[in-house]
């Protein structure tokens, strides 16, 4: 049985990791990022049309770089994160970028308690829903907070990425040896379990078909699905991500789904 993902564990993990994460990870405010070492919105063009005055909610915002990018385009942004230390970095970036957004300290599972009277034109989350126990339930709740025709963007860990990269995995009939990704079970990928700084966290991947079904069950029409290859210059990168040795050219790290409220 899969380990239960606990909100308290995730909070402690990100509070402890925050300063190191924001130091070694370079996330630009000059592009909307979808995941590590992959193209941003300037190349992928996945977001619904944006107009000044629209409202947006970011779940699991970290330092809120995506919300700041949207705010520069006239979008009225609310950004929410479970980690107070991540939000402290967001406040510092707000001052640096001279852009105002509303920051909320709350777990994704309780976002609705802080947005009771609000509705949004866009709700987005980049690599955060893999850290919650029931992402399907979150998607259903997200749909109820959209304005008619509103959009949803979720990027998350790709199920193939939670396999193991093995050197010399395959030998062909000519004796040539190839590296590759080994995954024991695509339909139930192994968890990415993290034990750092005395804290514990779990990142969980799901099949692409599961995410597609969850969008549909929430009343969302899937308008785009992407599994981008790595690029050399990415809006979200680090030395480790950049030095992937070609693995991310062959196995996607990020799954992106964009949907629209059908009601």
Identify the residue ranges that each predicted region occupies.
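A short glycine-rich, Lys/Arg-flanked "PGG" loop and its adjoining helix->strand segment in the class I
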Residues: 136-151
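Acceptor-substrate binding/catalytic loop of class I
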Residues: 156, 160-164, 195-210
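C-terminal lobe and adjacent flexible extensions of AdoMet/dcAdoMet transferase-like proteins
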Residues: 214-263
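Short alpha-helix
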Residues: 191, 202-225
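A conserved beta-strand element that flanks and buttresses the S-adenosyl-L-methionine
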Residues: 124
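Conserved class I S-adenosyl-L-methionine
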Residues: 1-52, 65, 69, 93, 151-189, ...
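Class I SAM-dependent methyltransferase SAM/SAH-binding core
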Residues: 57-59, 63-111
